[in-house]
From Swiss-Prot:
Organism whose genome encodes this protein: Mus musculus
A GO-annotated cellular component: endoplasmic reticulum membrane
Function: C-mannosyltransferase that mediates C-mannosylation of tryptophan residues on target proteins. The reaction occurs on the luminal side of the endoplasmic reticulum and involves the transfer of a mannose unit from a dolichylphosphate mannose (Dol-P-Man) donor to an acceptor protein containing a WxxW or WxxC consensus sequence. C-mannosylates RSPO1, a Wnt signaling regulator, preferentially at the first Trp residue in the sequence WxxW. C-mannosylates the netrin receptor UNC5A, preferentially at the third tryptophan of WxxWxxWxxC sequence.
Protein name: Protein C-mannosyl-transferase DPY19L3
All ranges on the Lumenal side of the membrane: 65-154, 257-262, 307-308, 360-414, 486-487, 540-716
Family: Belongs to the dpy-19 family.
Pathway, per record: Protein modification; protein glycosylation
Domain of life of the native organism: Eukaryota
Coiled coil: none
Catalytic activity: L-tryptophyl-[protein] + a di-trans,poly-cis-dolichyl beta-D-mannosyl phosphate = C-alpha-D-mannosyl-L-tryptophyl-[protein] + a di-trans,poly-cis-dolichyl phosphate + H(+)
One GO MF term: mannosyltransferase activity
Length: 716
């Protein structure tokens, strides 16, 4: 039975100064909800404004680039053949498969034509979905055929608008990455504006629309944004899973759309390896990211009909090596400073050796030689011996694969980007060095200190990741100009993050003993705002001039050539010539090619060198036999190659062929002593004299100021 009794008297509890009294607590309870609600409201409002600005600036960038493309070519007014010719070199080759899919009677026949293609390389049937990264063209062609837009939008506009739309995604992803790092969307706005004002050095989409990197880099930027968020500490399990999904999807799409994906992700894996080794990143999160890279590559490999070049990539070998060695090498992150250093050096050596061992084993098992030209090029580029290899020299002599020109930094400095970037880089490198030393030192005493007080110098994992990322991609850009677009876009993100980062300004103010929250707040907002105002003042007149400058596509010689081929040659005719021109022939005429610009195949590289003997010192009988061995009916000679002056002596195409053939080069200057004079004159020059020995094998059927087309006789 329940009773009610008098409550026992209890002693009053002394309230500490750190805790409010009951009366004060009641007052706080009345105040907190409104304060929390107000803070939450401003946070939601700020996020809404920041998100709206991100979408707007992404769309504006897309429209801006599309307008520049239209103004430069007058794309809406030129003929279809001129539009297709404007897709130069390999861009035209990729677009031709989009066109091929649209022209196929059914989607099934279109797929069959790509899987069993016999027009891209004569006398061969190749699987284009295995050889090339063209799933994006397949996807777009399917969308165009399925969606009810044929009456309102031409296929070419659907294609280019998709690419310009991806630029909006790209800029938005850069914006979000900078916002995540700094904690303010003002940083994202500054990053996006820097990207636009440094357009010459951050993108080339407006004049190389179908290029693989223009498809891939937006997904790469999304992946970096997702990784930046994933590396934040104390994420909720649901947020972590959703972020991992975003990383997986973006990594997969990046891998699917660009053949150089494995090299970019190898640098990312190195970033993770460095941070994990220096204890600046949670080991489990690094493991997740290694696993995502491997699984995405294997999935792409499956979709590309088990492309052996993917299986033999250094990335897969490296990631497997890291995971294996880390499992075998126990207690890697314990001990004194010197002990940790020795363990780390051993770890590096084991991973490096195991990577080379696994990669060599895989390549021998698969008999993989498709990527050997890349390693020959790298070996020659970094001074590990001269080479006469035609393919390696072809890359070495291209400006795009040379060192980054110094005038790039001059242009980047005009918008203050380079100055801001170097300022932030120096501060964060010093911070990272201190943190790395702290982590590698004897951890027992330092960890006890951390339990009582926060470190004076610290670097968040997401900031550390972006720091090492920008350093490694900077080294890549400095060594190979073509890769600068990977660095300069991230440079915008990193510089804007630093200017808006409270951690960066706090560290600097501490050094001069002027640190307080108000000064930090003023600097992190005042400096970016002043920079934004300067950018608007400096760049607005130039942007207006660009938008008002109207040009027009003009290439009458190439238009005349394509029109003649369409009207005067059989549809099954086989054409030989330069890789760049033949891509246009494939797109504009649908004729069969002997070779093309997609260079990631050993047999194709050998065939290209054989076809290029038309610019070497070879007899007409030799050239005729080589061309006929590939089923050639017509050969196109270009004066711009035969009499080339763009490159210096030793880098002209005819010089590369002469050296590869063991012949002395033309023109003033010395040749290597073991090179000998050729027995025959240069074919592309001598054939124009119409001598009997040439006329017996080649008949000129077309000529203009740029091109000469010869029909091959079928006699042996």
């Amino acid at each position: 039975m329940m009773y009610i009794r008098q409550r026992k008297e209890t002693k009053p509890i002394e309230v500490s100064e750190d805790f409010p009294s009951p009366k004060e607590d009641v007052k706080l309870e009345k105040k907190l909800p409104s304060g929390c609600a107000s803070g939450r409201f401003w946070k939601i409002l700020s996020s809404a404004v920041g998100g709206t600005v991100a979408l707007c600036i992404g769309l504006l960038t897309s429209v801006y680039l599309a307008t520049l493309h239209e103004n430069d070519l007058w794309f809406s007014n030129i003929k279809e053949v001129e539009r297709e010719i404007s897709f130069r070199t390999e861009c035209g080759l990729y677009y031709s498969y989009y066109k091929q899919m649209l022209q196929a009677p059914t989607l099934l026949q279109g797929f069959h034509g790509l899987i069993y293609d016999n027009k891209t390389e004569s006398m061969r049937t190749i699987n284009l979905l295995q050889r090339m990264n063209i799933y994006q063209e397949v996807f777009l062609s399917v969308l165009y055929r399925v969606l009810p837009i044929q009456k309102y939008l031409e296929p070419v506009y659907f294609y280019i608008y998709t690419l310009f739309g991806l630029q909006a995604v790209y800029v938005t992803a850069l914006y979000i990455t900078s916002w995540l790092l700094s904690g303010t969307w003002l940083s994202g706005l500054l990053a996006a504006l820097w990207y636009v004002t440094n357009r010459i050095d951050t993108t080339r989409v407006e004049f190389t629309i179908p290029l693989r990197e223009n498809w891939a880099l937006p997904f790469f930027a999304i992946q970096i944004a997702a990784i930046t968020y994933f590396l934040r500490p104390n994420l909720q399990p649901l947020s972590e899973r959703l972020t991992l999904l975003a990383i997986f999807v973006s990594t997969f799409l990046f891998s699917l759309t660009w053949q150089f994906n494995q090299f970019m992700m190898l640098l990312q894996a190195l970033v993770l390896f460095i941070l994990d080794s220096l204890d600046m990143l949670p080991a489990m999160k690094a493991t997740w990211l290694y696993g995502i890279q491997i699984s995405c590559l294997l999935l792409v490999c499956t979709l590309q009909f088990f492309n052996s070049m993917i299986l033999g990539s250094l990335l897969i070998s490296f990631n497997l090596s890291v995971l294996i060695v880390r499992k075998l090498q126990k207690n890697l992150k314990t001990g004194s400073f010197l002990t940790r250093i020795w363990k780390l050096l051993l770890h590096l050596l084991l991973v490096f050796c195991l990577t080379l061992f696994l990669n060599n084993i895989i390549k021998k098992v698969l008999n993989l030689k498709s990527d050997e030209h890349i390693f020959k090029f790298l070996k020659a580029k970094f001074g590990f011996g001269a080479t006469r290899d035609f393919d390696a020299n072809l890359y070495l002599c291209e400006e795009a694969f040379g060192l980054l020109p110094l005038n790039t930094f001059q242009r980047l400095s005009e918008t203050l980007l380079f100055y801001a970037y170097m300022f932030v880089l120096v501060v964060t490198v010093v911070t990272a060095s201190v943190v790395a030393f702290h982590n590698l030192s004897d951890s027992t005493s330092l960890k006890s200190m951390d339990q009582t007080r926060k470190r004076a110098v610290d670097l968040k994992p997401e900031a550390a990741y972006n720091l090492i990322h920008t350093i490694l991609f900077g080294v890549l850009a400095l060594s190979t100009m073509r890769m600068k677009y990977l660095w300069t876009s991230h440079m915008c993100v990193f510089a804007s993050f630093g200017l808006c980062s409270s951690e960066v300004w706090e560290l600097l103010l501490r050094l001069v003993h002027l640190c307080n929250p108000k000064r930090i707040w003023v600097l992190r907002y005042l400096v970016p705002v002043l920079t934004l105002l300067y950018l608007c003042y400096k760049s607005w007149p130039g942007v207006m001039d660009e938008l008002s400058e109207l040009k027009e596509f003009y290439d009458p010689d190439t238009v005349e050539l394509m029109t003649w081929i369409n009207s005067n040659t059989p549809r099954k005719a086989v054409f030989a010539g330069s890789m760049q021109l033949l891509a246009g022939v494939k797109l504009c005429t649908g004729r069969t090619l002997t070779n093309h610009p997609h260079y990631e195949d050993k047999s194709l590289r050998e065939r290209t060198q054989a076809v290029y003997q038309i610019y070497a010192k070879r007899s007409p009988e030799e050239v005729h036999a080589l061309l006929r061995s590939f089923g050639t009916d017509f050969v196109i000679l270009e004066d711009s190659i035969c009499y080339e002056r763009r490159h210096h002596r030793g880098c002209r195409l005819r010089d590369l062929l002469d050296v590869a053939n063991g012949h002395e080069m033309d023109g003033p200057g010395e040749s290597d002593p073991d090179l000998r004079p050729a027995d025959h004159p240069r074919f592309c020059e001598e054939i124009k004299r119409n001598l009997p020995s040439y006329a017996a094998h080649f008949t000129r059927v077309f000529q203009n100021k740029t091109f000469h087309v010869y029909k091959l006789s079928r006699n042996k």
